[in-house]
Swiss-Prot record:
Main location: membrane
Lineage: Eukaryota, Fungi, Dikarya, Ascomycota, Taphrinomycotina
A Gene Ontology biological process term: proton transmembrane transport
One Pfam family here: ATP_synt_H
Species: Schizosaccharomyces pombe (strain 972 / ATCC 24843) (Fission yeast)
Stated name of the protein: V-type proton ATPase subunit e
Topological relation to the membrane, as annotated: Multi-pass membrane protein
């Protein structure tokens, strides 16, 4: 289920990027708006995915110390 969540959120991010490409304000700096929004969505997705996957598959297993 963990990998599926990452894939679904990635598809949602791609959809939001495509929508932002067409909905961005028109004018002299349209391409700046488009790239800024797409980069924002992709960076937020990467930050979330790396954090989520690091918690899903930790490098060191948690250990319990009994006294």
């Amino acid at each position: 289920m963990g990998g599926l969540v990452v894939l679904l959120v990635g598809l949602l991010t791609a959809l939001m990027s495509v929508v932002s490409y067409y909905v961005s304000p028109k004018g002299n700096n349209t391409s700046t708006w488009q790239m800024s929004l797409i980069l924002t969505f992709s960076c937020c997705y990467l930050l979330w995915a790396i954090t989520y996957l690091a918690q899903l598959h930790p490098l060191e297993a948690p250990s319990r110390v009994l006294e």
